[in-house]
Amino acid sequence: MSLDFKRYLCSRINWDSSVIGIMGERGVGKTTMLLQRIKEKYANPDDTFYISLDHYWFGTHELQDLIKFMYKRGITEFYIDEVHKYKGWSTILKNLVDELQDLRIVYTGSSLLEIDNAKVDMSRRQTIYTLRGMSFREYLEYEGILKINPLAFEELLTDHVAVSMEFVPKTKILVAFDNYLHTGVYPFYKTAGKDFLVRLKEVVDTVMESDLPATEKITYDTIEKCKKLLMIIAENVPLQPNTDKLAASLGTTRDTLLKLLYKLDKAEILELLTVELKSYKKLVNPGKIYLGNTNLMYALSPGIELGTLRETFFIDQCASVGTVQMPSKGDFIVNEKYLFEVGGEDKTFDQIAGIPDSYLAIDGIETGYGARIPLWMFGLLY
């Protein structure tokens, strides 16, 4: 297990917390983070214990019994993978933390988990983090091309020219950007090689066939509808849905359709663009529906439209660090303030002329000027 490259979240976690939860999309590297932490902290790996709850061993054995058994033998820190595969996991962990002095737990789970419910049990003792797919900045480091510190959003808006001038001469940044759009979001692209897109399709299938049923009371028929829904969207991105017609085509109700859409959004397979701030507690009609990232477009969409590819990258990167909404003019509004149009080198301000805090995110350029910012630079935010 190499420590040469670590995900952005590693340095943000307060590892002193007694209970740490790391949520995230399947395939983004949660397990690798756990194993790196073990290697980094323990000279002797036998001083801690790693558990994967998707192992068949737990079909006939209890998690709490295993932890108590190892605790009595001097193990006080446990790394638990895929908690969503174990029924009643949050109550079990709460009871163990209450019962066993100085017990420490780091766990991972699907982004589909309703952690708000779990927080009722351990709200004062656990800290929850979300691991996103790799940013373009991380990809550059992972590939050994460049090492760049993350930029705050406002810093990007004001300092993008100086930042790009520092790094652009060192590499063919647009070539790297194109490679990232194809295969750079999920760290396993390195081991998957030419099979990456096939593997990514399998990841999506696993989310629908395994993770969804593990986190929701859901029938086989609903899973099949979910798959059909995803294919309809993948073939028509960005989809501007008529929810009544879309529900009818799936043979379901509008309410069920919205629940499925928001579940796929939470799983980061989709990105729902709404006029008001998105909330999983208030399911409103999305104005547009995108796939969750550009790699998913190449894996699932029969044809790639360049404008949609650009917009998908922009919304994915910006939504990782802030909020993105659908404005009345322009393409996106970020953090309820900054208005953006996304396009190629010929893009102008015509559609958003005279609007304060408006910018262009321009593809195909290495360096921008003023309010024209290179699209690739929005991949430097985390």
Where are the regions a protein language model picked out?
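A cross-kingdom feature that marks ATP-driven nucleic-acid transaction machinery
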Residues: M1-L3, I13, I20, Q36, ...
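Conserved P-loop NTPase "ATPase switch" module shared by AAA+ and STAND
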Residues: Y71-W89
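Structural recognition of the conserved hydrophobic beta-strand(s) that form the central parallel beta-sheet
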Residues: Y79, R104-S110, T130
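Walker A (P-loop) phosphate-binding loop of P-loop NTPases
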Residues: R26-G27
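Accessory nucleic acid-recognition modules appended to NTPase machines
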Residues: F188-S328
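Short glycine-rich substrate-engagement loop in P-loop NTPases that contacts/grips substrate
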Residues: P45-E77
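Interdomain motor-coupling "hinge/lid" segment immediately C-terminal to the ATP-binding subdomain
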Residues: S110, D116-E224, L230
